[in-house]
C-alpha cells in the first residue's frame, strides 16, 4: 500500500540549534512508537523520513530533491559550496557516488501524503500567543554568489576619489536592499547578505575583491523574478559608479509552493479538536516539504520558537509546545488514514 510519510532533516547550519529539523524526525519516531504501543490499526503504513543537506550548503535541498525526483545530473555535477568545494568532491571524500542520488526518487503512486512538523523559526506564533501554525505555503528562495572586483591599493596613498574599492560597492548594494524591496517586493519579501569575504583582507589595504552571498525570498515567483532583476540592475549601476566589475552565480532557484488544502484542513480540524490555539500562516523559510508537494499532498505544522530565534545556539521551543506539536502530528496522521 502507499505510505504516509512524516519527517524532516537532521542537519543544521554551522552554530545552529537543536530543534531545527530534528524535531520533525524525533516526533515522527514518537508517533510511530505510540501507534505500536497502543496497537492502533492503520489503513496506510507510515514511513519516517530523515533527509540530508536541507540547509543548502550546495544551493539546494539534496535529500528532499532526490526523493521527489527534482535533481538533475547537471546540478549534481556542478553544485558547489561558497568555498568552491563541489558536491561531487564532498560525496567522493565520504565514499559516496553522486550518481546514486538520481535513483532515490519515490514513485508518487507509493506515497499517499507527507507531513512535516517544524519549529516556526520566527516570532509570529509567540507574538500572537498561538500554539500551532497551520502552514498554507512555503516561500520560494534564490541564492546567489556575488563578486565585486576592483583594485587592491595602499590605504594611505590611494586617494579616495581614485579608488576601485570593492567593499564600497558591497556597502552601496546593502544600502539599496530596502529600496529594492519597497519598489518591487511585498511584506513577504526578504533579501539577505549573509556571508562576506573581503580580499586581500588587510587593515591597511583597500579591498580589491568582495565576495558575498545574497538570498532572496517571497511567496510569489513573479515577485522573486522582479527582485532578482532589480538586484542585477543595482549591482551593474554600482559597479560602474565605483569602477568595479561584478560577477554573480545563481546557486539555486526554488519556487514557492502551496500546501495541500485537504492536509491543511485535516491539521486545522485536529488542532481545533485538541483545543489548541492556532493560526494559518505562510512559511518564510524553505523546507523539505516544498519538494514533496511535487509528488504528494503535503502539509506542515509549526510550533513557536522562543524569541523567534533559529539558526543559532540559543534556538529553543518550550517542551509543552513540542508535546502539543507532536499531538497534532499524531492525530493528523490518524485522521488522514480515514480521509485520504
What are the roles of these predicted feature ranges?
Residues 227-236:
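Short amphipathic alpha-helices in soluble, non-transmembrane regions
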Residues 7-8, 278-328:
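Zn-dependent metallopeptidase/amidohydrolase metal-coordination segment
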Residues 73-75, 217-221, 251-253, 308-319:
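Short beta-alpha connecting loops at secondary-structure transitions
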Residues 192-201, 213-215, 219-220, 245-264, ...:
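A short beta-alpha structural unit
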Residues 1-17, 35:
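Acidic/His- and Gly-rich active-site-bordering loop/insert found
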Residues 31-45:
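Flexible, small-residue-rich helix->loop connector segments that border functional cores
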Residues 41-45, 101-105, 157, 179-193, ...:
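Flexible, glycine/charged-enriched surface loops at secondary-structure junctions
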Residues 11, 53-222:
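Midchain, well-structured core segments that form catalytic/ion-binding scaffolds
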Amino acid at each position: 500500500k502507499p505510505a504516509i510519510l512524516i519527517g524532516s532533516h537532521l542537519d543544521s547550519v554551522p552554530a545552529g540549534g537543536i530543534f531545527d529539523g530534528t524535531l520533525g524526525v524525533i516526533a515522527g519516531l514518537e508517533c510511530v512508537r505510540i501507534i505500536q504501543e497502543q496497537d492502533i490499526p492503520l489503513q496506510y503504513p507510515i514511513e519516517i523520513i530523515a533527509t540530508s543537506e536541507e540547509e543548502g550548503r550546495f544551493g539546494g535541498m539534496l535529500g528532499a530533491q532526490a526523493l521527489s525526483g527534482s535533481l538533475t545530473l547537471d546540478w549534481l555535477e556542478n553544485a558547489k559550496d561558497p568555498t568552491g568545494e563541489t558536491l561531487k568532491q564532498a560525496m567522493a571524500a565520504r565514499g559516496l557516488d553522486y550518481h546514486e542520488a538520481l535513483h532515490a526518487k519515490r514513485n508518487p503512486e507509493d506515497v499517499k501524503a507527507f507531513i512535516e512538523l517544524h519549529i516556526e523559526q520566527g516570532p509570529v506564533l509567540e507574538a500572537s500567543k498561538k500554539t500551532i501554525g497551520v502552514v498554507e505555503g512555503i516561500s520560494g528562495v534564490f541564492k546567489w554568489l556575488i563578486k565585486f572586483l576592483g583594485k587592491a591599493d595602499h590605504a594611505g596613498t590611494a586617494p579616495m576619489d581614485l579608488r576601485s574599492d570593492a567593499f564600497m560597492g558591497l556597502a552601496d548594494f546593502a544600502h539599496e536592499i530596502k529600496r529594492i524591496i519597497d519598489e518591487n517586493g511585498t511584506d513577504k519579501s526578504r533579501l539577505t547578505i549573509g556571508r562576506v569575504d573581503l580580499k586581500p583582507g588587510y587593515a591597511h589595504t583597500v579591498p580589491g575583491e568582495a565576495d558575498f552571498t545574497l538570498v532572496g525570498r517571497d511567496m510569489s515567483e513573479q515577485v522573486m523574478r522582479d527582485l532578482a532583476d532589480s538586484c542585477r540592475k543595482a549591482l551593474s549601476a554600482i559597479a560602474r559608479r565605483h569602477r568595479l566589475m561584478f560577477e554573480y552565480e545563481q546557486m539555486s532557484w526554488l519556487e514557492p509552493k502551496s500546501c495541500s488544502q485537504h492536509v491543511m484542513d485535516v491539521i486545522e480540524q485536529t488542532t481545533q479538536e485538541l483545543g489548541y490555539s492556532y493560526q494559518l500562516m505562510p512559511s518564510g523559510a524553505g523546507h523539505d516539504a516544498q519538494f514533496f508537494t511535487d509528488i504528494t499532498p503535503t502539509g506542515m505544522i509549526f510550533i513557536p520558537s522562543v524569541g523567534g530565534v533559529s539558526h543559532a545556539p540559543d534556538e529553543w521551543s518550550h517542551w509543552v509546545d513540542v508535546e502539543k506539536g507532536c499531538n497534532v502530528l499524531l492525530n493528523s496522521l490518524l485522521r488522514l488514514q480515514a480521509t485520504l
